[in-house]
UniProtKB/Swiss-Prot annotation:
Disulfide bridges in this chain: C47-C52, C48-C59
Propeptide: 18-44
Entry keywords, A to Z: Amidation, Disulfide bond, Secreted, Signal, Toxin
Cellular localization per UniProt: Secreted
Similarity comment text for this entry: Belongs to the conotoxin A superfamily.
Protein name, as recorded: Alpha-conotoxin CnIJ
Signal in keyword set: yes
Cleaved signal peptide residues: 1-17
Domain remark in the UniProt entry: The cysteine framework is I (CC-C-C). Alpha3/6 pattern.
Modified residues (Cysteine amide): C59
Species this protein is from: Conus consors (Singed cone)
GO molecular function, one term: acetylcholine receptor inhibitor activity
One GO CC term on file: extracellular region
Short name of any one Pfam family annotated for the protein: Toxin_8
């Protein structure tokens, strides 16, 4: 009986984890793109981060 419950929990956990892995791929790629944009702006001498005091209002957005 305990083995059956254990097996059910393991299978349920495995099935539930697959959709969440594939859903995060698109969001992760989008976040990487934003980071690369920020680094490019930083190399050009512009800072789009709010901590910079809003010096640059046209930050490629």
């Amino acid at each position: 009986m305990m083995f059956t419950v254990f097996l059910l929990v393991v299978l349920t956990t495995t099935v539930v984890s697959f959709p969440s892995d594939s859903a995060s791929d698109g969001r992760d790629d989008e976040a990487k793109d934003e980071r690369s944009d920020m680094y490019e702006l930083k190399r050009n001498g512009r800072c789009c981060h709010p901590a910079c005091g809003g010096k640059y209002f046209k930050c490629g957005r």
